């Protein structure tokens, strides 16, 4: 029965995304919600200017509808589900505001870094307040073992750091057609398996709903993309995957399963540090996916390579937790 629920969930999430797209994409075009491409980016990206953005709305709507329907039909609404939806929608709304300012108000940078950071921290604080009052644990477990360390009052600081850092890391990965959609589907799929293994079926249903939603979106986001998810989608997905890691006590494993996001972020950090200290750049451009474009790789080759890396890291994460 539970296996059927998972199958129905991924199919429903996929179909809702696929069916929404032909309606929503022309609507975005009519509103002139087109992506602006930065001039310092790869020249090959200039032709993408004007491609509809804010498509993350479709992903979020699919996740909400699928999760609610499947939970009401086969399970019951749990606090885990409420927390997952809260963070996903909260970070999605923050991303929507950022996209809206960029696209409609023509402020290229959207929200300021300070404004975005405050929004991310506020959502993380509300999440942790509910998490804490539900008597949730403050320990972090070593993957593949029963060994854990209680961080006590430091844990909320770590939660805020993980949510802010994780959502931004996922956001940085959204730079090529289909790159984030594919890597997100893989990472959420891995966490769905691990949540299922823990008998946290509500979390597994949510994770599978995300897989279905992003795969449906990928149909229209694969190269050449007809729509971009924007910060609306990338921040929502980032917040969601970190929340899953916290609820399943797999915070450390997130670094492995979400390894592509971590590597992309490290490439930006290293690039900035190197340039500020030596005046030289390590990469031709950061995040890392742009470096490979500038050394001559096709966009599709970069995307497939990163998907493959994400899949290998996801398998490694599952192996460590389940079979090691």
UniProtKB/Swiss-Prot annotation:
Ranges annotated as spanning the membrane: 5-25, 52-72, 77-97, 117-137, 147-167, 176-196, 203-223, 227-247, 250-270, 302-322
EC code: 2.7.8.13
Pathway annotation: Cell wall biogenesis; peptidoglycan biosynthesis
Keywords, comma-separated and alphabetical: Cell cycle, Cell division, Cell membrane, Cell shape, Cell wall biogenesis/degradation, Magnesium, Membrane, Metal-binding, Peptidoglycan synthesis, Transferase, Transmembrane, Transmembrane helix
UniProt keyword DNA-binding present: no
Pfam families in the record: Glycos_transf_4, MraY_sig1
Main function: Catalyzes the initial step of the lipid cycle reactions in the biosynthesis of the cell wall peptidoglycan: transfers peptidoglycan precursor phospho-MurNAc-pentapeptide from UDP-MurNAc-pentapeptide onto the lipid carrier undecaprenyl phosphate, yielding undecaprenyl-pyrophosphoryl-MurNAc-pentapeptide, known as lipid I.
Family named by the database record: Belongs to the glycosyltransferase 4 family. MraY subfamily.
Protein name listed in UniProt: Phospho-N-acetylmuramoyl-pentapeptide-transferase
Species of the source: Bacillus licheniformis (strain ATCC 14580 / DSM 13 / JCM 2505 / CCUG 7422 / NBRC 12200 / NCIMB 9375 / NCTC 10341 / NRRL NRS-1264 / Gibson 46)
